[in-house]
Amino acid sequence: FKSDYKYKKAEFKDDDSKYAKLIKSIEANGIGVNKIIETPKAIGLELTQFTHPNLDIVEEIIRSASYEAGVSKTVKKNLRVANLQGVSEYNKEFENNSLLIYERKSKRSFNTKTNFTFRPYLASREDFFKGALLLENNSELIIKDNFFFSTNLKYSIADNFEDLTLPPVNTYPAQVRSDVKDYLRSFGDGIFIGRAQFDYHITPKKNHHLMVSAGILEEMFSGVGFEYLYFKQDSNYAFGFEIFDVTKRDYEMRFGTLDYKNVTGSANFYYRNYDIIPFDAKVSYGEY
């Protein structure tokens, strides 16, 4: 697997230690350093990251950062994603026999980004193509390393969804998303909420991961639920299941709800291909 990622060099001060340089170099490339420990033969790095989709990129960054910082010892990593245990190259014994060099203090942080997006709607009964130009804000409050609150707010600058007036063909009863046109017609009624949810991540046992979510989960549903994932280190597949208790939101897409509730569940299989044509795949079966 060849990456197009370009390593970013960090700026150092004259009096920076090799560990300060190592931290700056790694964090300049989108990876957080939680802890550095050292033994006579090796250095242990506890890292957290959400940016890079491939472990090869992370390893490339660590190699380049170690060289740039002048670190000559073997580097062992403990990689976490939202505090879920991903890759671990050292154990408790290594940690107990090491010297603590650095530990980041946990603190809250807030990230926000606003941009323009285009929302198409194809092959409706009224017309083949409808669409909207949206101004979207995505924000995330990191309360703890494994506890987040994220929001998505939308405002329609221009759309032609008001033309979507023909009702769905009522072939089957309880077509859950058959009233999507009622949601789309409300895009022009001011700011609406695409998502506002809490997420909590935990790895209770090696290779076993849980995520609990609650709040406004998407444009049409709010609720609470969890996802279980089994992922073994160095494998290219994962599997699990998810269960959610959801309530349908009203068409204004703010805080109101409709008189429809359901419990959904699905089994999931994930596969990552590293061969000539790299790709990620997800196969899911269940009630949505």
Name each region found by the language model.
Residues K21, A132, K232, E242-R254, ...:
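Exposed, low-structure sequence patches enriched in small/polar residues
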Residues G131, S139-F147, I202-K206, I216-M220, ...:
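Outer-membrane beta-barrel strand-turn architecture
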Residues L22, N29-G30, H208-M211, S222:
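Phosphate-interacting basic helix/loop segments used at nucleotide- and nucleic-acid interfaces
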Residues V224-Y228:
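A short acidic, amphipathic alpha-helical/loop segment
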Residues F1-I202, F255-G265:
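Outer-membrane beta-barrel initiation region
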Residues P120-E126, I157-D163, E218-S222, D234, ...:
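Gram-negative outer-membrane beta-barrel proteins
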Residues P53, N236-A238:
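Short amphipathic alpha-helical segments with coiled-coil-like heptad repeat character
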Residues F1, G44, T112-S124, F149-T151, ...:
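Transmembrane beta-strand segments that form the barrel wall of outer-membrane beta-barrel proteins
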